Each structure stands twice: as C-alpha cells, then as structure tokens.
Amino acid sequence: ASATWGAAYPACENNCRKKYDLCIRCQGKWAGKRGKCAAHCIIQKNNCKGKCKKE
C-alpha cells in the first residue's frame, strides 16, 4: 500500500515524497522498530493528504 500511496496524490507527491520516503526506508531497515516508524508514516501521510485537499 505504501508503494502506491504517492500515485494516488500526484499533485502533492513532489512536496511530500522525500519525507515519506524516509518512512519507507525506516520501515524496511528497522523491522524491530516498525511500530515507531509506522506511527511516523501515518502522521506524515495524513499531513500530505491535508495539503493535497487544500491544493
């Protein structure tokens, strides 16, 4: 799901993708800390959705 999220919001992707990609890398590299990384990802994703709606 995380891999296709950006495609659903093309207008915001460039603005948010860098920070969101950090989440994806975090989830991939730190499996033991996935809960913390996932929580950060959810926050980041919601922030980007909010920006997208405003645009």
UniProtKB/Swiss-Prot annotation:
User: Which Cys residues form disulphide pairs?
Assistant: C12-C52, C16-C48, C23-C41, C26-C37
List modified residues, type Hydroxyproline: P10
In which compartments does the protein localize?
Secreted
Note the effect listed for K18Q.
No change in toxicity
Please tell me whether the keyword Oxidoreductase is annotated for this protein.
no
Effect after changing Y9F:
5-fold decrease in toxicity
Q: Name one GO molecular function term.
A: toxin activity
Q: What is the effect of changing R25Q?
A: 400-fold decrease in toxicity
Task: Tell me where the transmembrane regions lie.
Answer: none
**Entry's Gene Ontology cellular component terms:** extracellular region
| Any Pfam family matching the protein | Toxin_13
Protein keywords: Disulfide bond, Hydroxylation, Ion channel impairing toxin, Neurotoxin, Secreted, Toxin, Voltage-gated sodium channel impairing toxin
Q: What is the effect of changing R34Q?
A: 20-fold decrease in toxicity
User: According to the UniProt record, what happens if one changes K29N?
Assistant: No change in toxicity
Question: What result is annotated for mutating E13Q?
Answer: No change in toxicity
Give the signal peptide, or none: none
Function summary: This toxin increases the excitability of nerves by delaying the inactivation of the voltage-gated sodium channel (Nav). Only acts on some crustacean. Is more abundant, but 15-fold less toxic than neurotoxin B-II.
The record's comment on protein family reads: Belongs to the worm B-toxin family.
Domain statement:
Has the structural arrangement of two alpha-helices stabilized by disulfide bonds (CSalpha/alpha 4(S-S)).
What is the protein name stated in its UniProt record?
Answer: Neurotoxin B-IV
Identify the species of origin: Cerebratulus lacteus
